[in-house]
Regions:
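Tryptophan-paired
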Residues: 1-24, 95-172
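Loop/turn elements at helix/coil->beta-strand transitions in domains of secreted/extracellular proteins
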Residues: 232-234, 307-312, 318, 377
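Short, low-hydrophobicity acidic/polar segments
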Residues: 1-85, 93, 161, 169-170
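Low-complexity, serine/threonine/proline-enriched polar segments
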Residues: 37-56, 252-288, 292, 343-370
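Outer/extracellular conduits and scaffolds centered on Gram-negative outer-membrane beta-barrels
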Residues: 82-84, 315, 321-322
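Residues within well-ordered beta-strands of beta-sheet-rich folds
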Residues: 7-9, 85-89, 236-238, 313, ...
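Short, compositionally biased
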Residues: 141-146, 154-308, 409-422
Length: 422
């Protein structure tokens, strides 16, 4: 109707008494009509949930009217934000990989906690957002997991107009580095990477916790991919054993909670130690009856890693296969005929060179106190099941031996060497 005006606002308020301007006979804009509401609006201090953030986002509109068919009217509203918005690009490090085969960017940052009264809404794109009244300004401060100040932002009153936003990049925001991801690269406790050919001093002054042994996404399990949000980059071997001379189980179960892998191909294709471990945890409640799984899991207490990883776990037989192929230099394990064979996986491969020495070579730059070297006749537990037994890889000077152990007794040195995916 020509003499009528239509106004809307969001979010809904149960009491709008005194929140709209008195009629003067003149046509008012929505900003003028809702001036008392806008002036008195107080965004929530804690906007850390989407619901709280949305409830703080005052919007208004003045409707336009169009005549439709059959004497109908069409009302159109275009909502305008009335609060000011601070968008903060959280400090993060981005590795952009230059490998020939495509590997997604690896993004990580220290956990950020806010200690200001203002608590922003964290968005999945690596930013946080906070709405505030333009006339009030705001202060936002955060610290990292070392309890050190990460950043502090102060916005003065009327510095940002209502309906506007400003992007802040404390500490430079996202920092990008080009890197060619390779087997042998060093993985650090804070999530950073060092190239495999970094000099000794750089390696020994960095907090290295693992060695990259697989960079092919096709050889990383679906469970690892799922827990990492669908994007994976590599597998990493720990520098130390989680346990030595430990059994896989205390009392051998009558049946397994895992699928049986008996052939070479089945062992090679079992590439998700994370799934195996979590399946056992789900079925049994905990790892109290499975010392090898428990040792790998508890390794996370002593050598914590960022949330951008799976955390440490017991590798599967296929992951151990890759570890021995790429770090151990075993030519038989690189043979496609072996990888696709239906023959029994319980098999000794001779003529593979000094496998422990080959593995240790990748850790040569690591200080002795920060690593456990491999020795001849080490037996590496895996989480792969074979009917009533568990896959175990023996390594020695001259070859490797994939055994199926039917009992929990020791065979030479039974070790747990955890892995992780990132």
């Amino acid at each position: 109707m020509p003499d009528e005006n239509y106004y809307i606002y969001y979010p809904y308020q149960s009491d709008m008494t005194g929140k709209t301007a008195a009629s003067t006979g003149a046509t008012l804009t929505d900003a003028e009509f809702y001036a008392p509401l806008i002036d008195s609006w107080q965004p929530r201090k804690d906007q850390s949930s989407y619901e709280a953030y949305a409830a703080s986002d005052l919007m208004t509109a003045n409707g336009s009217v169009e005549n439709g068919t059959d004497n109908s009217l069409t009302l159109t509203f275009s909502m305008a934000h009335r609060m000011a918005l601070a968008v903060v690009e959280l400090p993060a490090f981005v590795y952009r990989f230059t490998n020939q085969h495509s590997i997604p960017d690896y993004v990580f940052s220290s956990p950020t906690e806010f200690d200001s009264e203002a608590l922003p809404y964290l968005v999945s794109d690596g930013t946080c957002r906070y709405l505030f009244h333009p006339s009030a300004g705001m202060e936002l401060s955060a610290y990292n997991d070392s309890r050190q100040c990460e950043f502090s932002i102060e916005i003065q009153p009327n510095q940002i107009a209502g309906g506007s936003y400003r992007l802040y990049k404390p500490n430079g925001g996202r920092v990008m580095k080009l890197h060619t991801l390779q087997v042998g690269d060093f993985f650090l406790a804070d999530g950073h990477l060092l190239p495999y050919d970094a000099d000794n001093e750089k390696v020994q002054t960095s907090n290295v916790v693992g060695i990259v042994f697989q960079t092919n996404p096709a050889r990383i399990g679906d469970a690892e991919k799922k827990v990492l949000g669908g994007e994976v980059h590599a597998l990493v071997m720990a520098l130390k054993n989680a346990a030595v001379d430990v059994t896989f189980w205390i009392t051998r179960p009558v049946e397994s909670y895992l699928p049986a892998c008996s052939s070479k191909a089945e062992g090679y294709n079992d590439i998700s130690g994370y799934w195996n471990s979590e399946q056992m945890r789900k079925a049994c409640g905990d790892f109290s009856s499975y010392p090898a799984l428990k040792a790998a899991d508890e390794y996370n207490k002593y050598y914590p890693v960022p949330a951008t990883t799976t955390g440490w776990y017991l590798p599967s037989s296929g992951q151990c296969w890759d570890l021995l192929q790429y770090l151990g230099g075993c030519p038989a394990l690189a043979d496609p005929a072996e990888q696709t064979s239906d023959a029994l996986g319980y098999d000794e491969r001779l003529g593979q060179g000094d496998v422990p020495a080959a593995l240790n070579k990748w850790m040569a730059k690591i200080a002795d106190k920060d690593k456990h070297t491999f020795t001849s006749d080490d037996n590496i537990w895996t989480s792969t099941w074979s009917r009533s037994s568990v896959h175990n890889w023996a390594i020695y000077a001259g070859g490797v031996f994939c055994r199926y152990l039917y009992s929990a007794i020791d065979y030479e040195s039974m070790i747990v060497r955890p892995v992780l995916a990132f």
